[in-house]
């Protein structure tokens, strides 16, 4: 199981939001690339980057920070947040990003998703952010009428191989993931599921590994010292 340390960027800084709420923001580090180097030094195999300004529709202001992260580490990077064009996908891949995560646009524009999959294959991930079972969009500000499980099945038919599944109610709460919903998603599709939201301790990670989850994104628990990457090396996680 791959542990993906999360680096959320807003205004060029490494921050965390609680349940995706802009007003519940905590800044941890000025330098996202220094954080990436720290996680790499502690044994991370892959880094998960979210452009929060992009997710909230603010454009290109964090591309410089993303490029700095790519240059600062040797491990692969996946990036999401406000990616709504083939040109933006190409721009990120040209910077050296390994995988690109699509969210809102994958839900609202099937033709775009098909084109992205046809062009880039498994370098495309779709993020399914669920709020009470329904897909949330626009940086989690809006909730669609599409059930998360139905959406997952539909994108699998298109050719998506990997999803990030987030339970928004759990995100940043340090109260444990929604094991039942993660299991339901795993049982419903054949895609690789990367779980996100709510990790609070090593026991949560062990539980997800026992469910055969292939990857877990860990954010606040790392920044608050609840989970230590170096310690995980000897824990068979």
Swiss-Prot record:
Quickly give the catalysed reaction. Answer: 1-(5-phospho-beta-D-ribosyl)-5-[(5-phospho-beta-D-ribosylamino)methylideneamino]imidazole-4-carboxamide = 5-[(5-phospho-1-deoxy-D-ribulos-1-ylimino)methylamino]-1-(5-phospho-beta-D-ribosyl)imidazole-4-carboxamide
Which pathway does UniProt place it in? Answer: Amino-acid biosynthesis; L-histidine biosynthesis; L-histidine from 5-phospho-alpha-D-ribose 1-diphosphate: step 4/9
> Example GO molecular function term?
1-(5-phosphoribosyl)-5-[(5-phosphoribosylamino)methylideneamino]imidazole-4-carboxamide isomerase activity
Q: Which key words tag this protein in UniProt?
A: Amino-acid biosynthesis, Cytoplasm, Histidine biosynthesis, Isomerase
User: Recorded E.C. number(s)?
Assistant: 5.3.1.16
Residues the record marks as active site: 8 (proton acceptor), 129 (proton donor)
SUPFAM superfamilies per UniProt: Ribulose-phoshate binding barrel
Q: Where in the cell is it found?
A: Cytoplasm
Provide a GO CC annotation, any one.
cytoplasm
Chief localisation class: cytoplasm
Q: Name one GO biological process term.
A: L-tryptophan biosynthetic process
| Uppermost EC category | isomerase
Q: What InterPro entries does this protein map onto?
A: Aldolase_TIM, His_biosynth, HisA_bact_arch, Isoase_HisA-like, Isoase_HisA-like_bact, RibuloseP-bd_barrel
**Is NADP among the key words of this record?**
no
**Family to which this protein belongs:** Belongs to the HisA/HisF family.
Q: NCBIfam families under this entry? A: 1-(5-phosphoribosyl)-5-[(5-phosphoribosylamino)methylideneamino]imidazole-4-carboxamide isomerase (TIGR00007), PRK13585.1 (NF010112)
Q: What is the name attached to this protein's record?
A: 1-(5-phosphoribosyl)-5-[(5-phosphoribosylamino)methylideneamino] imidazole-4-carboxamide isomerase
Upper taxonomic classification of the species? Bacteria, Bacillati, Bacillota, Clostridia, Peptostreptococcales
